[in-house]
């Protein structure tokens, strides 16, 4: 966004310089983006899903609650937000080639969607509580960011330590049918 007075980009809205994520919130749904590009901005859903397994959020029975209150009552709590900044957010840099063969770098700031953040936190909490020797299954639909959920899970599981300071896991083995 260009400041109409100074004709300069607004720092808070500038990629990699300002806000790390932008949320669009209604009383029913949340969407997010890490890069504002005017009419070309691409928002991803940041919803919990419904109890029936559908997209969106359940509408609360209490008329004094919002279907999106998990955003401020859960995700944006200081400890949770710091956890996202420390363990999830990632600048992905890809080498690309244009149609004339010129190479360029494409930068994408990766911020977890709600279901990714939620499943990784649940998995890490279960592993901390239950310890080694258990099997876990992360199941996401097509195009929902399984690779990122797997990477965040493996990274966080490999860095869990006991109260004595020893690593909880000697290794983290990921079985997948994907080629990375």
What are these regions (language model features)?
Residues 1-176, 180:
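ATP-dependent helicase/translocase motor core
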């Amino acid at each position: 966004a260009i400041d109409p007075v100074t004709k300069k980009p607004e720092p808070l809205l500038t990629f990699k310089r300002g806000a790390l994520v932008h949320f669009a919130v209604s009383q029913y749904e949340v969407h997010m983006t890490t890069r504002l590009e005017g009419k070309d901005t691409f928002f991803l859903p940041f919803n919990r899903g419904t109890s029936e397994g559908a997209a969106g959020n359940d509408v609360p029975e209490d008329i004094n609650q919002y279907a999106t209150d998990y955003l401020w009552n859960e995700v944006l709590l200081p400890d949770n937000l710091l956890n996202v900044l420390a363990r999830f957010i990632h600048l992905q840099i890809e080498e690309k080639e244009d149609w004339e063969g010129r190479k360029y770098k494409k930068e994408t700031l990766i911020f977890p969607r709600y279901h990714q953040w939620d499943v990784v936190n649940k998995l890490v909490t279960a592993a901390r509580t239950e310890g080694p020797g258990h099997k876990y299954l992360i199941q996401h639909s097509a195009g929902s960011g399984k690779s990122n959920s797997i990477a965040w899970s493996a990274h966080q599981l490999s860095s869990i330590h006991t109260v004595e300071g020893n690593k909880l896991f000697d290794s983290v083995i990921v079985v997948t049918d994907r080629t990375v």
